[in-house]
Amino acid sequence: MSKAPLALLSVSNKSNIVEFAQGLIKAGFGLLSTGGTFRLLTEHNVAVTEVSDYTGFPEMMDGRVKTLHPKIHGGILGRRGTDDAVMSEHAIERIDLVVVNLYPFAETIARSDVTMNDAIENIDIGGPTMVRSAAKNHAHVGIVTDPADYTRVLEALGDGTTLTHALRYDLAVKAFEHTAQYDGMIANFLGSRVNENQEPEDFSRTFNVQLEKVQDLRYGENPHQKAAFYVENNALKSKQASIATAKQLQGKALSYNNIADTDAALECVKAFSTPACVIVKHANPCGVAVDTDQVAAYRTAFSTDPESSFGGIIAFNRPLTLAAAKAIIDNQFVEVIIAPSIEDGVLEATASKKNVRVLVCGDLPAPELRDRQLDYKRVNGGLLVQEQDLGLITANDLKIVTDVQPTEAQIADLLFSWNVAKYVKSNAIVYAKGQRTIGVGAGQMSRVNSARIAAIKAEHAGLATEGAVMASDAFFPFRDGIDNAAEVGIAAIIQPGGSMRDDETIAAANEHGIAMVFTGMRHFRH
Protein backbone atom coordinates (compact mmCIF):
# COMPACT_ATOMS: atom_id res chain seq x y z
CA MET A 1 0.00 0.00 0.00
CA SER A 2 1.04 3.62 -0.51
CA LYS A 3 3.02 5.14 2.31
CA ALA A 4 1.15 8.41 1.89
CA PRO A 5 -2.31 8.28 3.47
CA LEU A 6 -5.15 9.36 1.26
CA ALA A 7 -7.65 12.17 1.67
CA LEU A 8 -10.89 11.90 -0.30
CA LEU A 9 -12.51 15.20 -1.30
CA SER A 10 -16.06 15.33 -2.70
CA VAL A 11 -17.96 18.52 -1.91
CA SER A 12 -21.01 20.40 -3.13
CA ASN A 13 -19.99 23.57 -1.30
CA LYS A 14 -16.63 24.28 -2.89
CA SER A 15 -15.73 27.30 -0.74
CA ASN A 16 -11.97 27.26 -0.03
CA ILE A 17 -11.63 23.64 -1.17
CA VAL A 18 -8.69 24.42 -3.48
CA GLU A 19 -6.69 26.04 -0.69
CA PHE A 20 -7.59 23.21 1.68
CA ALA A 21 -6.49 20.60 -0.85
CA GLN A 22 -3.18 22.38 -1.35
CA GLY A 23 -2.68 22.41 2.42
CA LEU A 24 -3.38 18.68 2.65
CA ILE A 25 -0.78 17.92 -0.02
CA LYS A 26 1.73 20.03 1.88
CA ALA A 27 0.94 18.04 5.03
CA GLY A 28 1.69 14.78 3.18
CA PHE A 29 -1.64 13.49 1.86
CA GLY A 30 -2.38 12.03 -1.54
CA LEU A 31 -5.73 13.17 -2.89
CA LEU A 32 -8.73 11.37 -4.36
CA SER A 33 -11.71 13.24 -5.71
CA THR A 34 -14.91 12.99 -7.74
CA GLY A 35 -16.85 14.87 -10.40
CA GLY A 36 -16.99 18.62 -10.04
CA THR A 37 -14.53 18.69 -7.15
CA PHE A 38 -11.96 16.78 -9.24
CA ARG A 39 -12.43 19.16 -12.17
CA LEU A 40 -12.03 22.23 -9.98
CA LEU A 41 -8.85 20.91 -8.38
CA THR A 42 -7.26 19.95 -11.70
CA GLU A 43 -8.14 23.38 -13.13
CA HIS A 44 -6.01 24.82 -10.30
CA ASN A 45 -3.17 22.37 -10.95
CA VAL A 46 -3.73 20.44 -7.74
CA ALA A 47 -2.34 16.89 -7.95
CA VAL A 48 -5.37 14.63 -7.53
CA THR A 49 -6.53 11.17 -8.65
CA GLU A 50 -10.09 10.71 -9.83
CA VAL A 51 -11.96 8.09 -7.81
CA SER A 52 -12.95 6.15 -10.94
CA ASP A 53 -9.27 5.79 -11.89
CA TYR A 54 -8.46 4.59 -8.36
CA THR A 55 -11.28 2.02 -8.20
CA GLY A 56 -11.13 1.01 -11.85
CA PHE A 57 -14.88 1.44 -11.92
CA PRO A 58 -16.45 4.36 -13.81
CA GLU A 59 -18.99 6.85 -12.52
CA MET A 60 -22.38 5.82 -13.83
CA MET A 61 -26.10 6.56 -13.85
CA ASP A 62 -25.56 10.32 -14.22
CA GLY A 63 -23.30 10.38 -11.18
CA ARG A 64 -25.60 8.38 -8.91
CA VAL A 65 -22.86 5.78 -8.42
CA LYS A 66 -19.41 7.25 -7.84
CA THR A 67 -17.94 6.25 -4.51
CA LEU A 68 -20.02 3.18 -3.58
CA HIS A 69 -17.10 0.77 -3.96
CA PRO A 70 -15.14 -1.54 -1.58
CA LYS A 71 -11.86 0.23 -2.32
CA ILE A 72 -13.43 3.45 -1.03
CA HIS A 73 -15.39 2.15 1.93
CA GLY A 74 -12.80 -0.46 2.82
CA GLY A 75 -10.20 2.31 2.91
CA ILE A 76 -12.42 4.39 5.18
CA LEU A 77 -13.82 1.66 7.45
CA GLY A 78 -10.70 -0.50 7.73
CA ARG A 79 -9.48 -0.81 11.31
CA ARG A 80 -5.79 -0.08 11.42
CA GLY A 81 -3.94 -3.01 12.96
CA THR A 82 -6.98 -5.29 12.61
CA ASP A 83 -7.97 -5.23 8.94
CA ASP A 84 -4.53 -4.60 7.42
CA ALA A 85 -4.21 -8.09 5.91
CA VAL A 86 -7.61 -7.90 4.22
CA MET A 87 -6.86 -4.43 2.89
CA SER A 88 -3.50 -5.57 1.53
CA GLU A 89 -5.03 -8.66 -0.09
CA HIS A 90 -7.53 -6.53 -2.00
CA ALA A 91 -5.18 -3.60 -2.73
CA ILE A 92 -7.23 -1.26 -0.56
CA GLU A 93 -5.26 1.75 0.57
CA ARG A 94 -6.18 3.48 3.78
CA ILE A 95 -8.13 6.72 3.52
CA ASP A 96 -7.33 8.73 6.62
CA LEU A 97 -9.30 11.88 5.86
CA VAL A 98 -12.71 12.30 4.23
CA VAL A 99 -13.88 15.76 3.19
CA VAL A 100 -17.52 15.69 2.13
CA ASN A 101 -20.53 17.97 2.18
CA LEU A 102 -23.81 16.96 0.68
CA TYR A 103 -26.02 17.82 -2.27
CA PRO A 104 -27.86 21.11 -1.63
CA PHE A 105 -31.20 19.57 -0.68
CA ALA A 106 -32.23 22.51 1.55
CA GLU A 107 -31.56 25.06 -1.19
CA THR A 108 -33.40 22.91 -3.73
CA ILE A 109 -36.62 22.51 -1.74
CA ALA A 110 -36.58 26.20 -0.78
CA ARG A 111 -37.28 27.09 -4.43
CA SER A 112 -40.90 28.01 -5.09
CA ASP A 113 -40.87 26.01 -8.34
CA VAL A 114 -39.27 22.85 -6.94
CA THR A 115 -40.61 19.58 -8.32
CA MET A 116 -40.61 16.18 -6.68
CA ASN A 117 -38.02 15.03 -9.23
CA ASP A 118 -35.77 18.00 -8.37
CA ALA A 119 -35.92 17.03 -4.72
CA ILE A 120 -35.29 13.33 -5.35
CA GLU A 121 -32.26 14.03 -7.56
CA ASN A 122 -30.77 16.18 -4.79
CA ILE A 123 -30.93 13.41 -2.21
CA ASP A 124 -27.28 12.49 -1.72
CA ILE A 125 -26.48 8.80 -1.31
CA GLY A 126 -22.73 8.35 -1.68
CA GLY A 127 -21.94 11.44 0.37
CA PRO A 128 -23.79 10.47 3.57
CA THR A 129 -22.48 6.92 3.22
CA MET A 130 -18.88 8.15 3.23
CA VAL A 131 -19.60 10.62 6.02
CA ARG A 132 -21.11 7.95 8.25
CA SER A 133 -18.35 5.46 7.44
CA ALA A 134 -15.65 7.95 8.35
CA ALA A 135 -17.48 9.11 11.47
CA LYS A 136 -17.97 5.53 12.64
CA ASN A 137 -14.25 4.84 12.18
CA HIS A 138 -13.16 8.11 13.79
CA ALA A 139 -10.65 6.16 15.85
CA HIS A 140 -8.56 6.14 12.67
CA VAL A 141 -10.19 8.55 10.20
CA GLY A 142 -10.94 12.26 10.19
CA ILE A 143 -14.20 13.49 8.68
CA VAL A 144 -14.73 17.13 7.64
CA THR A 145 -18.23 18.22 6.61
CA ASP A 146 -18.01 21.97 7.24
CA PRO A 147 -15.72 24.34 5.29
CA ALA A 148 -15.46 26.39 8.49
CA ASP A 149 -13.31 23.56 9.90
CA TYR A 150 -10.70 23.60 7.14
CA THR A 151 -8.41 26.02 8.94
CA ARG A 152 -8.44 24.24 12.27
CA VAL A 153 -7.81 20.88 10.58
CA LEU A 154 -4.78 22.23 8.71
CA GLU A 155 -3.49 23.87 11.88
CA ALA A 156 -3.92 20.61 13.78
CA LEU A 157 -2.13 18.62 11.08
CA GLY A 158 0.84 20.95 10.95
CA ASP A 159 3.50 19.13 8.96
CA GLY A 160 1.96 15.69 9.50
CA THR A 161 -1.06 13.62 8.55
CA THR A 162 -2.43 12.74 11.98
CA LEU A 163 -5.22 14.44 13.87
CA THR A 164 -5.69 14.00 17.60
CA HIS A 165 -8.38 11.60 18.76
CA ALA A 166 -10.20 14.48 20.47
CA LEU A 167 -10.44 16.41 17.20
CA ARG A 168 -11.46 13.33 15.21
CA TYR A 169 -14.18 12.62 17.75
CA ASP A 170 -15.45 16.20 17.64
CA LEU A 171 -15.53 16.13 13.84
CA ALA A 172 -17.30 12.76 13.89
CA VAL A 173 -20.05 14.05 16.18
CA LYS A 174 -20.43 17.06 13.91
CA ALA A 175 -20.67 14.72 10.92
CA PHE A 176 -23.47 12.68 12.49
CA GLU A 177 -25.26 15.93 13.35
CA HIS A 178 -24.86 16.96 9.72
CA THR A 179 -26.35 13.75 8.31
CA ALA A 180 -29.13 13.75 10.93
CA GLN A 181 -30.17 17.23 9.86
CA TYR A 182 -29.96 16.23 6.20
CA ASP A 183 -32.11 13.13 6.67
CA GLY A 184 -34.54 15.12 8.79
CA MET A 185 -35.05 17.63 5.98
CA ILE A 186 -35.68 14.83 3.51
CA ALA A 187 -38.16 13.13 5.85
CA ASN A 188 -39.97 16.43 6.45
CA PHE A 189 -40.21 17.22 2.75
CA LEU A 190 -41.32 13.79 1.58
CA GLY A 191 -43.44 13.24 4.69
CA SER A 192 -45.51 16.33 3.93
CA ARG A 193 -46.44 14.83 0.56
CA VAL A 194 -47.77 11.44 1.60
CA ASN A 195 -50.98 11.66 -0.38
CA GLU A 196 -52.33 10.47 -3.69
CA ASN A 197 -51.09 13.47 -5.68
CA GLN A 198 -47.93 14.12 -3.62
CA GLU A 199 -49.16 17.66 -3.02
CA PRO A 200 -47.56 19.55 -0.11
CA GLU A 201 -49.46 19.46 3.17
CA ASP A 202 -49.08 21.90 6.05
CA PHE A 203 -47.38 19.44 8.39
CA SER A 204 -45.28 16.37 7.67
CA ARG A 205 -46.01 12.87 8.96
CA THR A 206 -43.06 13.08 11.31
CA PHE A 207 -41.56 16.30 12.62
CA ASN A 208 -37.79 16.65 12.50
CA VAL A 209 -35.95 19.74 13.65
CA GLN A 210 -32.31 20.18 14.62
CA LEU A 211 -31.28 22.60 17.31
CA GLU A 212 -27.76 23.66 18.23
CA LYS A 213 -26.78 24.48 21.80
CA VAL A 214 -25.38 27.99 21.91
CA GLN A 215 -25.36 28.59 25.65
CA ASP A 216 -25.50 26.74 28.95
CA LEU A 217 -27.64 28.82 31.30
CA ARG A 218 -27.10 29.27 35.04
CA TYR A 219 -30.57 27.81 35.59
CA GLY A 220 -34.04 27.75 34.10
CA GLU A 221 -37.11 29.71 35.12
CA ASN A 222 -36.16 28.89 38.71
CA PRO A 223 -32.79 28.15 40.34
CA HIS A 224 -33.55 24.45 40.88
CA GLN A 225 -34.05 23.88 37.12
CA LYS A 226 -31.13 23.17 34.79
CA ALA A 227 -31.33 24.89 31.40
CA ALA A 228 -29.62 25.61 28.09
CA PHE A 229 -30.41 27.72 25.03
CA TYR A 230 -30.73 25.88 21.73
CA VAL A 231 -31.14 27.58 18.37
CA GLU A 232 -32.66 26.21 15.19
CA ASN A 233 -30.04 25.66 12.50
CA ASN A 234 -32.14 27.52 9.94
CA ALA A 235 -32.38 30.46 12.38
CA LEU A 236 -28.58 30.65 12.53
CA LYS A 237 -28.51 30.95 8.73
CA SER A 238 -31.51 33.28 8.49
CA LYS A 239 -31.26 37.01 7.97
CA GLN A 240 -34.45 37.54 9.98
CA ALA A 241 -33.79 39.42 13.20
CA SER A 242 -34.53 37.33 16.28
CA ILE A 243 -33.34 36.65 19.80
CA ALA A 244 -31.63 33.56 18.35
CA THR A 245 -29.43 35.64 16.04
CA ALA A 246 -29.01 38.74 18.22
CA LYS A 247 -25.51 39.78 19.27
CA GLN A 248 -24.79 40.80 22.86
CA LEU A 249 -22.52 43.84 23.15
CA GLN A 250 -22.50 44.38 26.90
CA GLY A 251 -23.64 42.95 30.20
CA LYS A 252 -23.97 39.71 32.11
CA ALA A 253 -24.83 36.47 30.36
CA LEU A 254 -28.49 36.23 29.43
CA SER A 255 -30.63 34.12 31.73
CA TYR A 256 -33.45 31.78 30.73
CA ASN A 257 -36.03 34.41 31.68
CA ASN A 258 -34.05 37.18 29.95
CA ILE A 259 -34.13 35.24 26.69
CA ALA A 260 -37.84 34.49 26.93
CA ASP A 261 -38.74 38.08 27.81
CA THR A 262 -36.45 39.59 25.19
CA ASP A 263 -38.05 37.38 22.57
CA ALA A 264 -41.49 38.62 23.64
CA ALA A 265 -40.39 42.26 23.50
CA LEU A 266 -38.67 41.96 20.13
CA GLU A 267 -41.56 40.11 18.50
CA CYS A 268 -44.00 42.73 19.78
CA VAL A 269 -41.98 45.70 18.54
CA LYS A 270 -41.70 44.04 15.11
CA ALA A 271 -45.46 44.50 14.75
CA PHE A 272 -45.06 48.26 14.29
CA SER A 273 -43.96 49.90 11.06
CA THR A 274 -43.49 53.29 12.75
CA PRO A 275 -40.81 53.96 15.42
CA ALA A 276 -41.87 52.19 18.62
CA CYS A 277 -40.71 51.23 22.09
CA VAL A 278 -41.94 48.13 23.94
CA ILE A 279 -41.28 47.36 27.60
CA VAL A 280 -41.92 43.77 28.70
CA LYS A 281 -42.09 42.13 32.12
CA HIS A 282 -42.73 38.41 32.55
CA ALA A 283 -43.37 38.04 28.81
CA ASN A 284 -46.17 40.65 28.82
CA PRO A 285 -45.97 44.17 27.38
CA CYS A 286 -46.43 46.57 30.27
CA GLY A 287 -45.85 49.71 28.21
CA VAL A 288 -45.82 50.45 24.48
CA ALA A 289 -45.61 53.74 22.61
CA VAL A 290 -45.09 54.98 19.07
CA ASP A 291 -43.21 58.25 18.54
CA THR A 292 -40.63 59.52 16.05
CA ASP A 293 -38.70 60.87 19.06
CA GLN A 294 -37.16 57.75 20.59
CA VAL A 295 -36.71 59.32 24.01
CA ALA A 296 -40.36 60.35 24.02
CA ALA A 297 -41.40 56.85 22.93
CA TYR A 298 -39.44 55.33 25.81
CA ARG A 299 -40.67 57.78 28.44
CA THR A 300 -44.27 57.35 27.30
CA ALA A 301 -44.04 53.55 27.32
CA PHE A 302 -42.45 53.66 30.77
CA SER A 303 -45.16 55.93 32.15
CA THR A 304 -47.85 53.32 31.42
CA ASP A 305 -46.62 51.17 34.31
CA PRO A 306 -43.45 52.43 36.01
CA GLU A 307 -43.58 49.78 38.73
CA SER A 308 -43.77 46.84 36.32
CA SER A 309 -41.16 48.41 34.03
CA PHE A 310 -38.57 48.13 36.82
CA GLY A 311 -36.22 45.32 35.84
CA GLY A 312 -37.94 44.96 32.48
CA ILE A 313 -36.83 44.35 28.92
CA ILE A 314 -36.87 47.28 26.49
CA ALA A 315 -37.07 46.81 22.72
CA PHE A 316 -36.91 49.33 19.89
CA ASN A 317 -37.56 48.83 16.17
CA ARG A 318 -35.13 51.57 15.20
CA PRO A 319 -31.41 52.01 16.03
CA LEU A 320 -30.90 52.86 19.70
CA THR A 321 -29.96 56.53 20.01
CA LEU A 322 -27.46 57.85 22.51
CA ALA A 323 -30.15 60.09 23.98
CA ALA A 324 -32.53 57.16 24.53
CA ALA A 325 -29.79 55.04 26.09
CA LYS A 326 -28.96 57.83 28.54
CA ALA A 327 -32.65 58.34 29.34
CA ILE A 328 -33.05 54.65 30.20
CA ILE A 329 -29.89 54.37 32.29
CA ASP A 330 -30.68 57.55 34.22
CA ASN A 331 -34.29 56.55 34.83
CA GLN A 332 -34.55 52.89 35.78
CA PHE A 333 -33.07 49.50 36.42
CA VAL A 334 -33.30 47.50 33.19
CA GLU A 335 -32.30 43.92 32.44
CA VAL A 336 -32.00 44.04 28.63
CA ILE A 337 -32.10 46.64 25.87
CA ILE A 338 -32.45 45.32 22.32
CA ALA A 339 -32.52 47.29 19.07
CA PRO A 340 -31.57 46.75 15.41
CA SER A 341 -28.29 48.61 16.00
CA ILE A 342 -26.83 51.31 18.25
CA GLU A 343 -25.46 54.79 17.72
CA ASP A 344 -21.89 55.73 18.53
CA GLY A 345 -21.46 56.40 22.22
CA VAL A 346 -24.26 54.12 23.43
CA LEU A 347 -21.94 51.57 25.03
CA GLU A 348 -20.04 54.33 26.78
CA ALA A 349 -23.35 55.63 28.13
CA THR A 350 -24.46 52.21 29.37
CA ALA A 351 -21.03 51.22 30.72
CA SER A 352 -21.83 52.75 34.11
CA LYS A 353 -24.41 49.97 34.48
CA LYS A 354 -22.12 47.12 33.46
CA ASN A 355 -24.69 44.41 34.15
CA VAL A 356 -27.21 45.84 31.69
CA ARG A 357 -27.36 43.58 28.68
CA VAL A 358 -27.27 45.48 25.37
CA LEU A 359 -28.20 43.47 22.28
CA VAL A 360 -28.39 44.27 18.58
CA CYS A 361 -30.52 42.15 16.26
CA GLY A 362 -30.11 43.68 12.81
CA ASP A 363 -32.70 45.47 10.71
CA LEU A 364 -36.30 44.44 11.24
CA PRO A 365 -38.53 43.55 8.30
CA ALA A 366 -41.77 45.41 7.65
CA PRO A 367 -44.60 43.66 9.53
CA GLU A 368 -46.12 42.38 6.31
CA LEU A 369 -42.77 40.90 5.17
CA ARG A 370 -41.96 38.81 8.22
CA ASP A 371 -41.13 35.16 7.56
CA ARG A 372 -43.78 32.82 8.93
CA GLN A 373 -42.09 30.43 11.33
CA LEU A 374 -43.46 27.58 13.42
CA ASP A 375 -44.29 27.86 17.11
CA TYR A 376 -43.82 24.88 19.42
CA LYS A 377 -45.37 24.19 22.79
CA ARG A 378 -44.39 21.09 24.69
CA VAL A 379 -47.07 19.12 26.49
CA ASN A 380 -46.33 16.05 28.56
CA GLY A 381 -45.41 13.39 26.02
CA GLY A 382 -45.89 15.52 22.94
CA LEU A 383 -45.39 18.74 21.05
CA LEU A 384 -47.98 21.17 19.74
CA VAL A 385 -46.88 22.77 16.47
CA GLN A 386 -48.57 25.72 14.80
CA GLU A 387 -47.84 28.57 12.44
CA GLN A 388 -46.60 31.72 14.13
CA ASP A 389 -49.40 34.25 14.59
CA LEU A 390 -48.49 36.92 12.04
CA GLY A 391 -52.05 37.82 11.12
CA LEU A 392 -52.36 41.50 10.20
CA ILE A 393 -55.38 43.77 10.35
CA THR A 394 -55.66 47.08 8.51
CA ALA A 395 -58.33 49.76 8.57
CA ASN A 396 -59.86 48.18 5.47
CA ASP A 397 -60.40 44.94 7.38
CA LEU A 398 -62.45 46.51 10.17
CA LYS A 399 -66.19 45.93 10.31
CA ILE A 400 -68.00 48.73 12.10
CA VAL A 401 -70.93 47.14 13.96
CA THR A 402 -72.30 50.06 16.01
CA ASP A 403 -74.33 53.17 15.31
CA VAL A 404 -71.42 55.37 16.38
CA GLN A 405 -68.61 55.49 13.81
CA PRO A 406 -65.02 55.62 15.08
CA THR A 407 -63.01 58.70 14.13
CA GLU A 408 -59.80 58.44 12.11
CA ALA A 409 -57.78 59.06 15.28
CA GLN A 410 -59.70 56.34 17.07
CA ILE A 411 -59.14 53.89 14.21
CA ALA A 412 -55.40 54.57 14.43
CA ASP A 413 -55.50 53.92 18.18
CA LEU A 414 -57.65 50.83 17.73
CA LEU A 415 -55.12 49.32 15.32
CA PHE A 416 -52.28 50.28 17.66
CA SER A 417 -53.96 48.65 20.67
CA TRP A 418 -54.80 45.59 18.55
CA ASN A 419 -51.11 45.12 17.74
CA VAL A 420 -50.27 45.27 21.43
CA ALA A 421 -53.07 42.93 22.55
CA LYS A 422 -51.75 40.27 20.21
CA TYR A 423 -48.65 39.96 22.42
CA VAL A 424 -50.40 40.09 25.81
CA LYS A 425 -51.19 36.79 27.54
CA SER A 426 -54.88 35.88 27.30
CA ASN A 427 -57.29 37.03 28.43
CA ALA A 428 -55.84 40.30 27.13
CA ILE A 429 -57.27 43.80 27.39
CA VAL A 430 -55.36 46.90 26.28
CA TYR A 431 -56.42 50.53 26.81
CA ALA A 432 -54.71 53.05 24.54
CA LYS A 433 -54.89 56.66 23.47
CA GLY A 434 -52.65 58.77 21.26
CA GLN A 435 -50.56 55.80 20.06
CA ARG A 436 -49.56 54.74 23.56
CA THR A 437 -50.82 52.25 26.09
CA ILE A 438 -52.86 53.55 29.02
CA GLY A 439 -53.39 50.26 30.82
CA VAL A 440 -52.79 46.55 30.18
CA GLY A 441 -54.76 43.69 31.72
CA ALA A 442 -53.14 40.31 31.16
CA GLY A 443 -53.59 36.64 31.86
CA GLN A 444 -56.90 36.62 33.71
CA MET A 445 -59.33 33.73 33.51
CA SER A 446 -62.19 36.22 33.14
CA ARG A 447 -62.09 38.79 30.33
CA VAL A 448 -63.95 41.40 32.36
CA ASN A 449 -61.38 41.05 35.15
CA SER A 450 -58.59 41.77 32.65
CA ALA A 451 -60.52 44.92 31.72
CA ARG A 452 -60.82 45.91 35.38
CA ILE A 453 -57.09 45.37 35.91
CA ALA A 454 -56.25 47.51 32.87
CA ALA A 455 -58.35 50.31 34.36
CA ILE A 456 -56.71 49.92 37.77
CA LYS A 457 -53.27 50.05 36.15
CA ALA A 458 -54.19 53.24 34.31
CA GLU A 459 -55.52 54.90 37.45
CA HIS A 460 -52.46 53.86 39.44
CA ALA A 461 -50.20 55.43 36.80
CA GLY A 462 -52.28 58.62 36.79
CA LEU A 463 -53.48 58.10 33.22
CA ALA A 464 -57.01 59.00 32.18
CA THR A 465 -59.05 56.32 30.46
CA GLU A 466 -61.73 58.81 29.42
CA GLY A 467 -61.85 58.84 25.61
CA ALA A 468 -59.39 55.94 25.27
CA VAL A 469 -59.91 52.87 23.10
CA MET A 470 -59.97 49.26 24.21
CA ALA A 471 -58.65 46.14 22.46
CA SER A 472 -59.63 42.60 23.36
CA ASP A 473 -57.71 39.63 21.96
CA ALA A 474 -60.90 37.54 21.74
CA PHE A 475 -64.62 38.17 21.65
CA PHE A 476 -66.64 39.27 24.67
CA PRO A 477 -68.85 36.36 25.78
CA PHE A 478 -71.14 38.72 27.70
CA ARG A 479 -71.98 42.40 27.70
CA ASP A 480 -70.29 42.97 31.09
CA GLY A 481 -66.98 43.79 29.38
CA ILE A 482 -68.68 46.54 27.38
CA ASP A 483 -70.50 47.88 30.44
CA ASN A 484 -67.22 47.98 32.34
CA ALA A 485 -65.57 49.84 29.46
CA ALA A 486 -68.34 52.45 29.55
CA GLU A 487 -67.82 52.94 33.29
CA VAL A 488 -64.20 54.02 32.73
CA GLY A 489 -64.96 56.22 29.71
CA ILE A 490 -63.83 54.01 26.81
CA ALA A 491 -64.87 55.60 23.50
CA ALA A 492 -64.16 52.80 21.01
CA ILE A 493 -63.57 49.04 21.12
CA ILE A 494 -61.82 46.60 18.81
CA GLN A 495 -62.46 42.87 19.15
CA PRO A 496 -62.71 39.82 16.88
CA GLY A 497 -66.45 39.27 17.20
CA GLY A 498 -67.89 35.83 16.66
CA SER A 499 -69.66 35.28 19.98
CA MET A 500 -73.15 33.79 20.06
CA ARG A 501 -73.99 36.93 22.07
CA ASP A 502 -72.52 39.49 19.65
CA ASP A 503 -75.97 41.09 19.39
CA GLU A 504 -75.93 41.75 23.14
CA THR A 505 -72.47 43.32 23.12
CA ILE A 506 -73.35 45.46 20.09
CA ALA A 507 -76.53 46.59 21.83
CA ALA A 508 -74.53 47.44 24.96
CA ALA A 509 -72.07 49.50 22.92
CA ASN A 510 -74.94 51.36 21.26
CA GLU A 511 -76.56 52.03 24.64
CA HIS A 512 -73.34 53.61 25.89
CA GLY A 513 -72.54 55.48 22.66
CA ILE A 514 -69.34 53.50 22.12
CA ALA A 515 -67.99 52.79 18.64
CA MET A 516 -67.09 49.14 18.13
CA VAL A 517 -65.35 47.30 15.30
CA PHE A 518 -64.88 43.61 14.60
CA THR A 519 -61.66 42.22 13.10
CA GLY A 520 -62.77 38.66 12.41
CA MET A 521 -59.40 37.48 13.76
CA ARG A 522 -58.62 36.18 17.24
CA HIS A 523 -55.24 36.48 18.96
CA PHE A 524 -55.20 34.06 21.89
CA ARG A 525 -51.76 33.83 23.51
CA HIS A 526 -51.11 31.21 26.17
From Swiss-Prot:
Pathway, per record: Purine metabolism; IMP biosynthesis via de novo pathway; 5-formamido-1-(5-phospho-D-ribosyl)imidazole-4-carboxamide from 5-amino-1-(5-phospho-D-ribosyl)imidazole-4-carboxamide (10-formyl THF route): step 1/1; Purine metabolism; IMP biosynthesis via de novo pathway; IMP from 5-formamido-1-(5-phospho-D-ribosyl)imidazole-4-carboxamide: step 1/1
Domain of life, source organism: Bacteria
Gene3D superfamilies listed in its UniProt record: 3.40.140.20, Methylglyoxal synthase-like domain
One GO cellular component term: cytosol
Family annotation (PROSITE patterns): MGS
Protein family membership: Belongs to the PurH family.
Protein name as annotated: Bifunctional purine biosynthesis protein PurH
Source organism (scientific name): Psychrobacter cryohalolentis (strain ATCC BAA-1226 / DSM 17306 / VKM B-2378 / K5)
Taxonomic lineage: Bacteria, Pseudomonadati, Pseudomonadota, Gammaproteobacteria, Moraxellales
